[in-house]
Structures are given as C-alpha cells and as structure tokens.
Design a protein with these regions (language model features):
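Acyl activation and transfer enzymes in specialized metabolism, enriched
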Residues: 38-63, 176-195
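Active-site cores that bind ATP or allylic diphosphates and position pyrophosphate for catalysis
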Residues: 147
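Helical lid/core segments from catalytic subdomains that handle acyl or acyl-like groups
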Residues: 90-144
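Acyl-group handling in specialized metabolite and lipid biosynthesis
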Residues: 26-31, 38-44, 95-107, 187
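Active-site loop/lid in soluble adenylation, ligation, and acyl-transfer enzymes
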Residues: 48-54, 58-70, 75-76, 92-96, ...
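Histidine-centered acyl-transfer/condensation active-site motif
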Residues: 130-143, 160-197
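Gly/Ser/Thr-rich phosphate-binding loops and adjoining beta-strand/alpha-helix segments
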Residues: 6-8, 20-52, 68-84, 135-136, ...
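Domain-scale detector for complete catalytic domains at protein termini or as standalone homologs
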Residues: 1-13, 22-24, 36-41, 58, ...
Length: 206
C-alpha cells in the first residue's frame, strides 16, 4: 500500500519546496538504446519485444529509491512496489491501460503481461494498480519511427513515463530512441540518468 510521508523526512525535501507548485515541473530526457539483445531474445524465446523492454524498465528502476516516491496532488507518497504500465489496443479498436506488477522473474512477468493485456483487450476495462504501486507509464508508437516526444504537465498524473516508436535496424545492431519524462519533485537529472544507464545495462545482460 502507498502511504503519505513528510517530504522533510526525505532526501526530496528541497525538491518538494522548489518544484511542487512550479508551472511545469516535468523534465524529459532523450536517449537511444541499443536493443539488439532484446530482438535476439524475442526471436529465440518467442517473447514480445515490448514485454521484454517493460521488464527491463522495471528492473532498472527497482534499485533507485526515488522510484518508490511520487508526488500525488499536494502529497508525497511512498510505495513498496513498482508496476509498469502498457497501452493495449482493445477489441473495439480503441486503447486501454494495463498495469503489470514488476517482478524480477522474467517468466512470471511474461505470464502476467500476456494474461492481463489479453484480459484488458477483451473487457475494455483498464487495469489500475496505482493505489498500491508506483507506476511507470509507457507508450509504444509501433506504426512509425520517432525521434522523441515531449509530454505535457497535466497537473494530475505525475508518474514517470517512457515513449518509443519502432526500433531501427543498423548494420550490426538495432537502435531504439526513447523519451523519459519525470517529475522533478520525484527525482533529479542524476537519478534519471542513472535509470537510463541501468536500463541499457539490463537490456545487455538479460
């Protein structure tokens, strides 16, 4: 369960004062990932590419304590678990939202991913774990290549968010440009940079 904490009791105290009421507290980083290993595993094990990337996102975030905090309204909340959100095309042709609880067991994460994305697609009902988990949002624009995307500050959803398009085939590798948006109250640029480095490392050693 999430619980409200006093920002003054955390390392985010000064960031809370500086950024909670800023006109636009969201920051976006851009990075090109080498996803060659994910392509190989996807083909070898017949696993979905986006599932593998979501798994690596959860694993990369899990060791960074800032990912267990999130500003919600005027409060700073602390979580015990992380979930990764994926957008699903449902049976009506529209999109639904599906949160997958992160586990460091790839087989279990894959089972949950397949089970709940199919369920959401059929029922057209979102699966929301935000009451219990700090959710990392993701969106895959698979119809085209994109260089990046900058989100907007809604003032409602402060969750970290990643977006990507099609991966790009190079001579000896596959590249994937990604955008990572985060709330400055939750983390600083150094934490976001560490996460993106972790993400590349997790992709390489999966």
């Amino acid at each position: 369960m999430a619980r409200k904490i006093n920002p003054k009791d955390t390392t985010r105290a000064s960031a809370y004062e500086l950024w909670m009421n800023a006109p636009n507290p969201m920051v976006t980083f851009f990075k090109t990932l080498d996803v060659t290993n994910l392509i190989k595993i996807s083909k070898k094990k017949h696993m979905k590419f986006n599932m593998l990337l979501d798994f690596c996102i959860g694993k990369a975030a899990g060791s960074i304590k800032e990912f267990y905090l999130l500003p919600v309204g005027e409060k700073l909340m602390k979580y015990e678990q992380i979930a990764v959100n994926t957008i699903v095309k449902n049976k009506t042709g529209e999109v639904s939202s599906c949160d997958i609880l992160y586990t460091d067991n790839l087989e279990k994460f894959n089972q949950d991913y397949l089970k709940y994305t199919i369920q959401v697609a059929e029922t057209c009902r979102d699966r929301d774990l935000s009451n219990d988990c700090m959710v990392i949002g993701t969106s895959a624009i698979i119809d085209t290549e994109i260089d990046g995307a900058v989100g907007m500050n809604s003032g409602i959803f402060n969750n970290p968010f990643m977006i990507w398009g099609r991966y790009r085939k190079k001579v000896f590798r596959y590249d994937l440009p990604v955008s990572f948006q985060f709330h400055h109250t939750q983390m600083d640029g150094a934490h976001a940079g560490k996460f993106l480095k972790n993400l590349q490392d997790e992709i390489n050693r999966l």
